[in-house]
Swiss-Prot record:
Cysteine pairings via disulfide bonds: C31-C46, C38-C51, C45-C58
Protein name (Swiss-Prot/TrEMBL): U1-theraphotoxin-Cg1b
Tissue distribution of the protein: Expressed by the venom gland.
Localization in the cell: Secreted
The entry's keywords: Disulfide bond, Ion channel impairing toxin, Knottin, Secreted, Signal, Toxin
Length: 66
């Protein structure tokens, strides 16, 4: 009984991941969200995020931060 419940949960997780990946592929998202890698040349951060020069990933844009 426990094994079949785990298989059902695992199947639902796989279905969710597959649909999420298909959605990302169709939208063609060209900007990065929180902690997405950014370089400033080919990859950019979405609105509300800035590319951290130290870590090279997108961080929250704060007032007063350059």
């Amino acid at each position: 009984m426990k094994t079949s419940a785990l298989f059902v949960i695992f199947g639902l997780v796989l279905l969710f991941c597959n649909s999420f990946a298909a959605e990302l592929k169709t939208t063609g998202r060209g900007c990065g969200g929180l902690m997405a890698g950014c370089g400033g040349k080919s990859t950019f951060c979405c609105s509300g995020y800035n590319c951290s020069p130290t870590w090279k990933w997108c961080v929250y844009a704060r007032p007063g931060r350059r």
